[in-house]
From Swiss-Prot:
GO cellular component: ribonucleoprotein complex; ribosome
Name of this chain's protein: Large ribosomal subunit protein bL25
Function statement: This is one of the proteins that binds to the 5S RNA in the ribosome where it forms part of the central protuberance.
GO terms assigned for molecular function: rRNA binding
Quaternary structure annotation from Swiss-Prot or TrEMBL: Part of the 50S ribosomal subunit; part of the 5S rRNA/L5/L18/L25 subcomplex. Contacts the 5S rRNA. Binds to the 5S rRNA independently of L5 and L18.
Family: Belongs to the bacterial ribosomal protein bL25 family.
Protein species of origin: Anabaena variabilis
The entry's keywords: Ribonucleoprotein, Ribosomal protein, RNA-binding, rRNA-binding
Amino acid sequence: ALTVETKKRPIGSKPXALRRVGFILNXAPY
């Protein structure tokens, strides 16, 4: 799931923020 989010959104822009969004979408407890 994380790979899909990475491909969908440019990590170079804001990793952090993208990581948070990815975790939330995955459903992770973050």
